[in-house]
Amino acid sequence: MVGFTNLILLLQPEKKTLIMKAIWTILLLIVSNVFMTFAWYGHLKLQEMKISSSWPLIAVILFSWAVAFFEYCAQVPANRIGFIDNGGPFNLMQLKVIQEVISLTVFTLVAMVMFKGQSLQWNHIAAFFCLIMAVFFVFLK
């Protein structure tokens, strides 16, 4: 069986470059969204753990901004690498829909691990299906 890496090596150089740019874009968006989720919701876990309960709101905001800095350190390169006008494989709409699917997937995984009381309901699964269909439709020509 031919491995994924070997399959990429068999492709034409320009296709290989596009595939690698797509992979890097998606990996960087995953990293970005992990930081984004912690920036947006990590302070709630810190409050639950009694670490930040006494912090003033401005300290919580500054903490979240500090975490979000690392989100942008991954998100900006992801969009630059992946954008078609920069030689990437994705147009602007495709980048946005991919980012939203990654964002909600990462959020769901983090929420289920960090906040044990959260559960996945049928309507959440239906919403994820709609997102997958959004990805399908945005890639149609």
Where are these regions (language model features)?
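Polytopic alpha-helical membrane proteins, predominantly small-molecule transporters/carriers
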Residues: M20-K141
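Short, Lys/Arg-enriched N-terminal segments with co-localized hydrophobic residues
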Residues: F4-I19
